[in-house]
Regions:
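A cross-family structural signal marking well-folded subdomains
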Residues: 1-58
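Intrinsically disordered, low-complexity linker/terminal regions across diverse proteins
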Residues: 33, 37-368
Length: 368
């Protein structure tokens, strides 16, 4: 019995002191996620954070509007499926930034009233954390569900992290406060922001309509969104993306799995297409006026694509890449840039890529 208790509540202890500190820090952040979020917001400035959230809220509306106006242009979508997709987009809830409750000290004290922490007893704290989390989960069964609030996400540790996500089961997109900073979100120029942050938002919107998203309706209920003909046409169009990524060689003899990464690749392609449309419309409505970066001679469109590529700059070891290919549903960073851009006529035009070149192939994949 004691062994079962230890196995359930006492994780493997890292032998290295630095690793132990990292684990303790991570578990503390997970336990006190609302507190960490509040600390992060106050460090950035509450007023400044609110202003950025307002700007992001407007940008999300621009992205959703671009997606909405692009839907009727999809040749593979029937009239019935078009109506269903528009309805799902209309019902999508956006949670931007952070829940205001985390800045209320009284609320925080009440929320953590049951959590008794002992600075000298790690095992006791692990048990407390598991018990506390389970208690909160049980309480949710007796609460009235409101899809428009942060209830399902406010206590998660990644609100202050750089990670937007879409929840299929509730049709909710979360854009946490941690994302609202460079190299994703820039005050100016807007080209960089639309290219980096705008594509992330559009990527998450597209998840509502990828190979998994089409299995759920506007309320997040397991109910196929499209009719059978549209689903067949969608999968036919998706085959091009599947084959494209399956040809990408990460290391000698090691290729991207076009099946495992399909959903994310579809979202990447859709995100780029929608962000391109949104920035083009924004430029047009602002008389093609946008800020420029000093000392570099790039057009607005070129900066847009540089903004897209910038967050994916990374160097990985061969061993990490082999692990990534097996365990991650995302393509490696490099191919999340090259794949979508090679299918973009606007990119080829902006950078004058010759027809038939690697970044401007004559045959391009087109889903969105």
């Amino acid at each position: 019995m004691i062994w079962r208790l230890l196995a359930a509540f006492y994780p493997d202890r890292p032998p290295d002191e630095i690793q132990r500190k990292e684990r303790c820090l991570k578990e503390t952040e997970d336990m006190f996620a609302p507190v960490v979020t509040a600390m992060y917001i106050r460090d950035k400035g509450v007023e400044a954070s609110e202003q950025i959230v307002q700007q992001v809220d407007m940008m999300v509306d621009i992205m959703k509007d671009a997606f909405k106006h692009n839907l009727p242009k999809l040749s593979w979508m029937s009239a019935f499926s078009l109506s269903a997709a528009q309805e799902k987009l209309e019902h999508m809830v956006d949670l931007i930034g952070y829940p205001k409750s985390v800045l209320n000290s009284t609320w925080l004290d009440t929320f953590f009233a049951r959590a008794e922490i002992d600075a000298t007893d790690y095992l006791s704290n692990v048990v407390t954390q598991r018990s506390f989390s389970r208690h909160k989960e049980i309480l949710q069964f007796f609460e009235t569900y409101n899809r428009g609030l942060w209830n399902d996400f406010a206590h998660m540790p990644d609100i202050a992290y750089v990670n937007a996500y879409y929840n299929q089961l509730s049709n909710i997109m979360v854009v946490p406060i941690g994302m609202l900073q460079p190299p994703l979100f820039w005050v100016k120029p807007k080209s960089l922001t639309f290219g980096a942050f705008g594509i992330v938002v559009a990527h998450e919107i597209t998840h509502a309509f990828d190979d998994e998203g089409i299995l759920y309706d506007q309320y997040g209920t397991f109910n196929p969104l499209y009719d059978n003909k549209t689903i067949d046409e969608f999968h036919l169009a998706s085959n091009c993306v599947r084959n494209q990524y399956s040809d990408f060689e990460v290391l000698t003899g090691v290729r991207v799995d076009g099946n495992i990464t399909l959903g994310e690749n579809i979202a990447d392609h859709g995100g780029l297409k929608i962000a391109e449309i949104a920035y083009h419309e924004w430029l047009k409505s602002n008389g093609r006026s946008d800020s420029q970066l000093p000392a570099v001679d790039f057009t607005h469109e070129q900066l847009f694509y540089l903004g897209y590529a910038l967050p994916w700059c990374a160097v990985h070891s061969d061993n990490m890449m082999r692990t990534h290919i097996v365990k991650d549903e995302h393509a490696p960073d490099k191919f999340r840039v090259l794949g979508p851009l090679a299918n973009s006529p606007r990119f080829s035009e902006a950078w004058n890529c010759p027809i038939g070149s690697v970044m401007n192939p004559e045959s391009k994949c087109k889903i969105w």
